[in-house]
Amino acid sequence: MGYVGVCHKVYVCGMIRVVKHAALDSGRWKGLALLLFLAAAICLASLLSGGSGISARQAVAALLGAGDEAARNVMMEVRLPRLLAAFGVGGLLALAGVLLQALFRNPLADPYVLGVSGGAAVGALLAMITGAAAMGVQSAAILGALGAVAVVYLLARGGGTSRLLLTGVVIASACGALVSVLLAVADSGRLRGMVFWLAGDLGWALNPWSSLLAAVLAACLALLVARPLNVLAAGELRARSVGLQIEVWRTALFIACATLTAIAVINAGTVGFVGLITPHAIRLAFRTSDHRLVAPASVVLGGTILATADLLARTVANPRQLPVGAIMALVGAPIFIALLRRRAA
């Protein structure tokens, strides 16, 4: 093959690669548009559905500040705050899952499975029982989550999937035992509310706007550090070869995961499997592990998933309300088992 033939072959291969990348990028944009449409549809369904007997026309009027006072109270004091809390908490848990999976280099890492949510719950409950202020409860939850993720990392480091999951089970069990002890000594007047909160309840969100704002800010920060996350997820050898300060980044990820999980637990209790399901779904749908896409898309999908679970929790057993954590466990447990079997195969 002459020089002209070689140049022609290189040109053809290059054009094929450009076309493939263009088609892939086009598919990803379409996927993002579909994801945003799905999120908008769930928002609309969540705002218009419930057991209060409010029609769609009344709901829209109430959101616009018109209509009767009862409808406005239901929309502005119940449905809208729950929707905001669902998207905020779901986004936080999904992003925590993304960061944990990058930290442990394991697709089965999740705040709930590894006991990080349990650690945050222990810290928050302990602060509540001792009469701490809101800032004290938040700080205790972050410390509890940070302690749990640090213990899991130290015990499961380099041990593979089985060791990671076993360590998570042990930490989660220990946190569950501590929660039981704290509930046993808690004031009986607050016991029912604490139990329902622990099962996952968006109705207890103290400030739904704060969780949503935290999720948006966290997604923006994740975009800024997406490239180091990609390098860290590729392994220590790759990270050291490009001069990445591994221990600094690990410490930062510890703190970030603990903070995200703690904010979610404070607002909604222990809700599981959002951080496990969401990153997997995004990677499969977009056929990429690039955190520049996975992190922000996971925040949107995580919020959508939890908003859907909350919609089911409010409407399936109407007029009774189910814990949103129970809905997520019923959906997430079979998916977790399927992923575990797939990884073992």
Kindly give the residue locations of the regions a language model identified.
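Alpha-helical transmembrane segments in inner-membrane proteins
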Residues: 3-345
